[in-house]
């Protein structure tokens, strides 16, 4: 991946940690425990090693875009026009740790010196409702490109970039495994918006009439891909599944409640089949091919610890 003429500059975790400079750690261990996902053991040391430098880099990009915006306003003799949000996209496989990365970055950027308003959405809310997927016989393709209402997602991002106030985004429940039709999250003029999901770096196929259509990533000012060996992601997925059987799946309202009633051996066989026929296939066909489109790649090793960082050269 990182050949001689690669567009990326690669840093070991130790090298990357030096770029935090004197950036203070503003999160406590209890706050990090609250932010991380069930199966992600990220701790204070990992935040100091990786995420402080990343937050500092992102803040540099935000500040540079703000300076460019001000210079352009001077050039155009325009005043009192609000800068549109800086949008960060975060992609990667199921179970690789995208959500933890997104939440930690949100909190670190919120506490930056500029008192930025930082919002976070996931693209799960832009999945078609289960009723629609069932009607189209696509329930086993959840997370694949054709399971998302891309038109709705593009409309949402267009409104954000246009500076529209109080833009609503749909919410998704991991309990019912469905879009919450009667609940929305309101995004109102954030300084930074983080968009997290498996599909955010994917490109669209041209429609039959050959019209040019935008990609989700066209709206991003910076993009991150969370990466790891496929076998390791599979292991994390299965470990998460086993933990969820003992926690969230115990809820009778959970879509996956039936798995909690099975023996561990039976449930694990089902999880392995889901990984092989759905998540692995989606990773290989639709997610991994988008890795090279990211501005920065976080490459994880054992225990979800980042081993090296690849940053696209300017």
Curated annotation (Swiss-Prot):
Protein name stated in the entry: Pantothenate kinase
HAMAP family assigned to the protein according to its UniProt record, in alphabetical order: Pantothen_kinase_1
Chemical reaction(s) catalysed: (R)-pantothenate + ATP = (R)-4'-phosphopantothenate + ADP + H(+)
Keywords: ATP-binding, Coenzyme A biosynthesis, Cytoplasm, Kinase, Nucleotide-binding, Transferase
InterPro entries according to UniProt: P-loop_NTPase (IPR027417), PanK (IPR004566), PRK/URK (IPR006083)
GO cellular component terms given for this protein: cytoplasm
One GO molecular-function entry: ATP binding
CDD domains tied to this protein: PanK
Location of this chain's protein in the cell: Cytoplasm
Biological source species: Bartonella bacilliformis (strain ATCC 35685 / KC583 / Herrer 020/F12,63)
Pfam families on file: PRK
Enzyme Commission number, as recorded: 2.7.1.33
GO terms for biological process, alphabetical: coenzyme A biosynthetic process
Residues annotated as binding ATP: 92-99
Pathway per the UniProt entry: Cofactor biosynthesis; coenzyme A biosynthesis; CoA from (R)-pantothenate: step 1/5
Assigned protein family: Belongs to the prokaryotic pantothenate kinase family.
Gene, per the UniProt record: coaA
């Amino acid at each position: 991946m990182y050949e001689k003429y690669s567009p990326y500059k690669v840093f070991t975790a130790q090298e990357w940690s030096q770029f935090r400079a004197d950036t203070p750690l503003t999160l406590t261990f209890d706050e990090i425990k609250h932010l991380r996902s069930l199966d992600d053991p990220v701790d204070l040391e990992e935040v100091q090693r990786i995420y402080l430098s990343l937050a500092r880099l992102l803040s540099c990009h935000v500040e540079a875009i703000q300076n460019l915006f001000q210079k352009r306003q001077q050039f155009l003799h325009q005043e009192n026009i609000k800068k549109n949000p800086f949008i960060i996209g975060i992609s990667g496989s199921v179970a690789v740790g995208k959500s933890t990365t997104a939440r930690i970055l949100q909190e670190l950027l919120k506490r930056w010196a500029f008192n930025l308003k930082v919002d976070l959405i996931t693209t799960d809310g832009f999945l078609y409702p289960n009723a629609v997927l069932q009607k189209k016989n696509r329930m086993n393709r959840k997370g694949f490109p054709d399971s998302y209402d891309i038109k709705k997602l593009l409309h949402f991002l267009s409104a954000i970039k246009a500076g529209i106030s109080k833009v609503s985004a749909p919410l998704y429940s991991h309990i019912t495994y469905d879009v919450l039709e009667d609940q929305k999250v309101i995004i109102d003029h954030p300084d930074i918006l983080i968009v997290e999901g498996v599909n955010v770096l994917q490109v669209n196929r041209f429609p039959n009439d050959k019209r040019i259509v935008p990609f989700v990533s066209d709206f991003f000012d910076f993009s991150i891909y969370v990466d790891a060996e496929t076998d390791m992601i599979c292991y994390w997925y299965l470990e998460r599944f086993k933990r969820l059987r003992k926690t969230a799946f115990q809820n009778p309202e959970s879509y996956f409640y039936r798995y909690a009633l099975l023996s561990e051996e039976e449930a694990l066989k089902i999880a392995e089949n889901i990984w092989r026929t759905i998540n692995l296939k989606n990773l290989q066909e639709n997610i991994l091919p988008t890795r090279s489109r990211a501005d920065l790649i976080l490459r994880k090793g054992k225990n979800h610890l980042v081993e090296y960082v690849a940053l696209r050269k300017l």
